[in-house]
């Protein structure tokens, strides 16, 4: 009876002890109501102590019975014996890696003591697992139903934390949805997406469910993860559900973007009101200021080169975005005339636009003079005749000048002129030490189209602002043979005299990009934008650098470096030995055998070039061996910025236009969600590595484009090339990780390749007789039914029709656009 009473008391205390962390010793007095109090005698228990620990932790109990000759440990009235987890000492009991089965009533007993000879511990090993990502442990204690609780249907334990139903998060972030619940018996939870069961294969990269915390976790979310997520909690007595809505926001780290043409110049009279408007677009919260420029001692700038400005208006706590975007100047005076700047900044950088305020004197009321009516009418007629005569003379002179300059158009009747201004995608900076040659205002390409009634073909002209740092005289440029052409442009070899400023009298072989005769206004805008992109990126050894441009008095010429050995894919294929599948020109085979170190060097140089582009906030989007050029000294240079975009452009990360896409080089998030990041370039770099170590092999050989989509979703990757080490193949597979955030950065790739290149030796010649195309031989080497380029490189975007994007190839050292 005595032991049974202790067990009932222990069960009652364990029911009350549903806590998540071990607390200091809690003393509970047990009162015997069936008999009066007596002095402590033998076989009388001391006050029990309550302990609570987590699973996996160390349970350590110390028997406080001092002076005992012998101590015996028991659990639930059964003797404890040492084993691989249990250590029983004289006055210590230690259990490692505790589990819920270790919960119970522990006692240590001794003989020969005056006060008491049994001391008890009530141990509760909770089944809640702590996590720094979820709520604290005291909240989790309510998620577990106690054994003594009455049967009931599920209920939410923290409904106040589930009130936020709409969650909008940036792409590539981690999302957690929690539905903490309880019930007796303990309910089960399952998740639905858009009212359908949510399975692991429904999402690229899968998801995690932490049942102990009632939590759904999705890493690196993409736009396809948008939808309604419902947690359904149920037991045999009923069910409850709660729905969260997830919206994945496309965001790109960029400084504020100001709308072109705002603020505009304003002209008012003295006493009138002036108003400037500045439209700011920024993902991160921008800070906006209005500045007024002034002069001091006749100078507009200080000794440090910075302009003198005073802050007129700044964003504050009580200021809305629409209020700060408008500068209102009431009752202006002549002192208010001058330059005003709208300055916007965020954590990424700052941008600004400037406008001028012109103040004219107020109009005075004309003095009324009583002229005879006849004289007023005569004056009006004379002035009208004079103005008409002036207009006729001006028109005749202008037509004569136009005819003298362009005799081809003089014979064409009824010529109509349509003028259009196209803003360039050019970066704006306020840094005093910036190396950019671009001014603060966005330059415009002014395109004039002449259309004659006798000829249907438009004749485009353009007016591009001259950039002194890059302008090159046409007289010093001698065009040579064509190197290639594409959808809208062509590339020719040329000799540029004095383009190397260190050797002003020496001619340098260059490549010149230009438009074809049937190019459109969009083609011109694309070529100018590519030129501006190359200006912004700057110079690096492992990219094709801009050397100059001819923008005045003639067609637009973009002058770039010339690579004599063509593109990397043809360079590798031409050095294959006889007998391999690719047909090659024997006359182009190099006498120098390729070594393993040569291939690692190619990979290392391309990684360095991509590391530099990433540091300049530029994403290539079309990295492949066909877009890497090889110079005479075997230097790898990344080319083809036709698809490249600066991440400061707000519409860059998600491709909204349609056209031809290099699907076999594209990362899954770019292929399926059209999300482009530096990590999607890393995926393409892994495919380029595979091309290098197969000596110009075609990725996924024999796999149709339609089948490729399915294989990528199922996690299939290309096999290890024959000429590749296990370490380099693991590097490729790291680049092909399904979750973009788990891929290495270009900086890490450069460090690893530098180490491998240092350890490689020139004597490691390649076994070039091994087969190159070894992936999935069950598929015949057939082309996709979709229109594609070489080796099924490109696939049409099925969303809409659009002329093909520029695709560059290289023939005999040239660039094919």
Curated annotation (Swiss-Prot):
Residues 1-22 form the signal peptide. Residues 161-178 are annotated as: Heparin-binding. Residues 399-817 are cytoplasmic. CDD domains: IgI_2_FGFR, IgI_3_FGFR2, PTKc_FGFR2. One of its GO terms (molecular function) is fibroblast growth factor binding. The chain crosses the membrane at residues 378-398. The active site is at residue 622. It is a single-pass type I membrane protein. Keywords: Apoptosis, ATP-binding, Cell membrane, Cytoplasmic vesicle, Disulfide bond, Glycoprotein, Golgi apparatus, Immunoglobulin domain, Kinase, Membrane, Nucleotide-binding, Phosphoprotein, Receptor, Repeat, Signal, Transferase, Transmembrane, Transmembrane helix, Tyrosine-protein kinase, Ubl conjugation. Disulfide bonds join 63-108, 179-231, 278-342. Glycans are attached at residues 32, 84, 124, 228, 265, 297, 318, 331. It catalyses: L-tyrosyl-[protein] + ATP = O-phospho-L-tyrosyl-[protein] + ADP + H(+). It is found in: Cell membrane; Golgi apparatus; Cytoplasmic vesicle. SUPFAM superfamilies: Immunoglobulin, Protein kinase-like (PK-like). GO terms for biological process: angiogenesis; apoptotic process; cartilage development; cell proliferation in midbrain; cilium assembly; determination of heart left/right asymmetry; determination of left/right asymmetry in lateral mesoderm; determination of liver left/right asymmetry. Residues 477-766 form the Protein kinase domain. InterPro entries: FGF_rcpt_fam, Ig-like_dom, Ig-like_dom_sf, Ig-like_fold, Ig_I-set, Ig_sub, Ig_sub2, Kinase-like_dom_sf. Autophosphorylated. Binding of FGF family members together with heparan sulfate proteoglycan or heparin promotes receptor dimerization and autophosphorylation on tyrosine residues. Autophosphorylation occurs in trans between the two FGFR molecules present in the dimer. N-glycosylated in the endoplasmic reticulum. The N-glycan chains undergo further maturation to an Endo H-resistant form in the Golgi apparatus. Residues 26-126, 159-247, 256-358 form the Ig-like C2-type domain. Its main location: membrane. Residues 23-377 are extracellular. Monomer. Homodimer after ligand binding. Belongs to the protein kinase superfamily. Tyr protein kinase family. Fibroblast growth factor receptor subfamily. Tyrosine-protein kinase that acts as a cell-surface receptor for fibroblast growth factors and plays an essential role in the regulation of cell proliferation, differentiation, migration and apoptosis, and in the regulation of embryonic development. Required for normal embryonic patterning, limb bud development, lung morphogenesis, osteogenesis and skin development. Plays an essential role in the regulation of osteoblast differentiation, proliferation and apoptosis, and is required for normal skeleton development. This is Fibroblast growth factor receptor 2. It comes from Danio rerio (Zebrafish).
């Amino acid at each position: 009876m005595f032991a049974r009473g202790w067990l009932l008391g222990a069960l009652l205390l364990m029911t009350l002890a549903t806590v998540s962390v071990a607390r200091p010793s809690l003393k509970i007095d047990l009162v015997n109501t069936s008999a009066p109090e007596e002095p402590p005698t033998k076989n009388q228990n001391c006050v029990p102590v309550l302990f609570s620990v987590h699973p996996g932790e160390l349970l350590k109990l110390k028997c406080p019975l001092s002076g005992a000759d012998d101590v015996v440990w028991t659990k639930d009235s059964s003797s404890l014996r040492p084993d691989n987890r249990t250590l029983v000492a004289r006055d210590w009991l230690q259990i490692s890696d505790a589990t819920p089965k270790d919960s119970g009533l522990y006692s240590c007993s001794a003989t020969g003591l005056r006060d008491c000879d049994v001391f008890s511990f009530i141990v509760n090993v909770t089944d809640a697992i702590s996590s720094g990502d979820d709520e604290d442990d005291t909240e989790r204690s309510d998620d577990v139903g106690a054994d003594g609780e009455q049967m009931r249907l599920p209920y939410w334990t923290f409904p106040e934390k589930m009130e936020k139903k709409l969650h909008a998060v940036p792409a590539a972030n981690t999302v957690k949805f929690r539905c903490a619940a309880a019930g007796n018996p303990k309910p089960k939870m399952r998740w639905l997406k858009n009212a359908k069961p949510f399975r692991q294969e429904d999402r690229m990269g899968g998801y995690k469910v932490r049942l102990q915390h009632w939590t759904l976790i999705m890493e690196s979310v993409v736009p396809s993860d948008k939808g309604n997520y419902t947690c359904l909690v149920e037991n045999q007595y009923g069910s409850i559900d709660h729905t969260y809505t997830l919206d994945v926001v496309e965001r790109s780290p960029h400084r504020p973007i100001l709308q072109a043409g705002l603020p505009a110049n304003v002209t008012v009279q003295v006493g009138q009101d002036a108003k400037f408007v500045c439209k700011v677009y920024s993902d991160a919260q921008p800070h906006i200021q209005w500045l007024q420029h002034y002069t001091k001692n006749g100078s507009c700038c200080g000794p440090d080169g910075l302009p003198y400005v005073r802050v007129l208006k700044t964003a504050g706590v009580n200021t809305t975005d629409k209020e700060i975007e408008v500068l209102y100047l009431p009752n202006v005076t002549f002192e208010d005339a001058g330059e005003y700047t709208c300055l916007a900044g965020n954590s990424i950088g700052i941008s600004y636009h400037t406008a001028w305020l012109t103040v004219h004197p107020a109009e005075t009321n004309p003095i009324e003079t009583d002229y005879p009516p006849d004289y007023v009418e005569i004056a009006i007629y004379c002035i009208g005749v004079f103005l008409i005569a002036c207009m006729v003379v001006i028109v005749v002179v202008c037509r004569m000048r136009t005819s003298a300059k362009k005799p081809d158009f003089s014979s064409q009747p009824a010529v109509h002129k349509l003028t259009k201004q196209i803003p360039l995608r050019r970066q704006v900076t306020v840094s005093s030490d910036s190396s950019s040659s671009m001014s603060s205002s966005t330059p415009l390409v002014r395109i004039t189209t002449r259309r004659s009634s006798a000829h249907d073909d438009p004749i485009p002209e353009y007016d591009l602002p001259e950039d002194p740092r890059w302008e090159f005289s046409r007289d010093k440029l001698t065009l040579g043979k064509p190197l290639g052409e594409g959808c809208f442009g062509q590339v020719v070899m040329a000799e540029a005299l004095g383009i190397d400023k260190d050797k002003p009298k020496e001619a340098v072989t260059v490549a010149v990009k230009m438009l074809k005769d049937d190019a459109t206004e969009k083609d011109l805008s694309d070529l100018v934008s590519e030129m501006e992109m190359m200006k912004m990126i700057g110079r690096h050894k492992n990219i094709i650098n801009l050397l100059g441009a001819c923008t005045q008095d003639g067609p637009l010429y973009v002058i770039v470096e010339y690579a004599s050995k063509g593109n990397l894919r043809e360079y590798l294929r031409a050095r294959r030995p006889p007998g391999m599948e690719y047909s090659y020109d024997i006359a182009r085979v190099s006498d120098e055998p390729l070594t393993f170190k040569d291939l690692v060097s190619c990979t290392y140089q391309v990684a360095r070039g991509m590391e530099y582009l990433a540091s300049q906030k530029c994403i290539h989007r079309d990295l492949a061996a066909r877009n890497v050029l090889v110079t005479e000294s075997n230097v790898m240079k990344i080319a083809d910025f036709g698809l490249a975009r600066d991440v400061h452009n707000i519409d860059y990360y998600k491709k909204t236009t349609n056209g031809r896409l290099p699907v076999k080089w594209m990362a899954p998030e770019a292929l399926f969600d059209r999300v482009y990041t530096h990590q999607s370039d890393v995926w393409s770099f892994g495919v380029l590595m595979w091309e290098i170590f197969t000596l110009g092999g075609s990725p996924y050989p024999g796999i149709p484009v339609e089948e490729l989509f399915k294989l990528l979703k199922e996690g299939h990757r290309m096999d290890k090339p024959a000429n590749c080490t296990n370490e380099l193949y693991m590097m490729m597979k790291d680049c092909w990780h399904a979750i973009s955030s788990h891929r290495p950065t270009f900086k890490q790739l450069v460090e690893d390749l530098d180490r491998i290149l240092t350890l490689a030796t020139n004597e490691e010649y390649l076994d070039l007789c091994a087969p190159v195309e070894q992936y999935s031989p069950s598929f015949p080497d057939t082309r996709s039914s979709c229109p594609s380029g070489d080796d099924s490189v490109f696939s049409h975007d099925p969303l809409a029709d659009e002329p093909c994007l520029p695709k560059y190839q290289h023939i005999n050292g040239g660039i094919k656009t």
